[in-house]
Amino acid sequence: MYHFFVDRGQVNAGKVWIEGSDVNHIRNVLRMRPGEKLDVSDGSNTIYHCEIDRFEECQVVCEILSSEESYAEIPAQIYLFQGLPKADKMELIIQKAVELGVTAVIPMSTSRAVVKLDAKKEESKIKRWNGISESAAKQSGRTFIPQVEPVLSFKQAVERMQPLTHKLIPYELCENMDETRRLLYTIKPGESIGIMIGPEGGFDKDEISCALEHGIMPITLGRRILRTETAGMSVLSVLMFLLEQRTC
């Protein structure tokens, strides 16, 4: 079943009005016709099962057949602070993070990051990355589109993490798996979690010291050295399992 997103104001009186680029996609790419069915989310935990009623110039008007509460979201807010990786790895990271239930992705510029974005390039990248997030949210049946936020410096990212309930930083020199396990098991539904992942080459000692001074807890991901595009997915997978097993 095809899945689309609308604002809450586009759901009214038993109808859904789909607008924007999705109109062309539904009409000319998917070649859907009146009478065909699709699912719509409005950013809440509700899924609307709809039937296309008619096409207007800039809208697809759908009739709501039924609705149900969705349990697709992890019962916590998870923020991935990702050091800027090389090439197009960020696209893969965003896609998989959204599939695994992340709330938002915050790119970071760190001391060992090779990639440096000026304002123009950053604007273009953020737009593209949010498009990838939307596509991944549709594919995975999310009820909202996780945002890819503007790039932060490492110190800005540390400050951004401060209000979160749990702040974690996987670090290759952290070897205490028992402590990591204990920390992860303290995370409860309804809480917020920040995960800080370095680029290729990881974090330098000053960044690690800064993180520890601000209450960000080091954890280990095991005895193997993981690529930057693997590390965040490993933590997200563990959190998905731990949090969903307590609510399913």
Give residue ranges: language-model regions.
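Short, ordered loop/turn segments at secondary-structure junctions
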Residues: 9, 67, 109-112, 223-224
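RNA substrate-binding interface of SAM-dependent RNA methyltransferases
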Residues: 71-168
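Short, hinge-like loop/turn segments at secondary-structure boundaries
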Residues: 122-126, 186, 237-238
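Active-site/ligand-binding-proximal alpha/beta "capping" segment
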Residues: 164-202, 207, 216-219
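Mobile, glycine- and charge-enriched loop segments
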Residues: 38, 63, 69-81, 184-191
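N-terminal positively charged helical leader segments and presequences
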Residues: 1-69
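Structured adenosyl-cofactor binding patch, chiefly the S-adenosyl-L-methionine
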Residues: 205-248
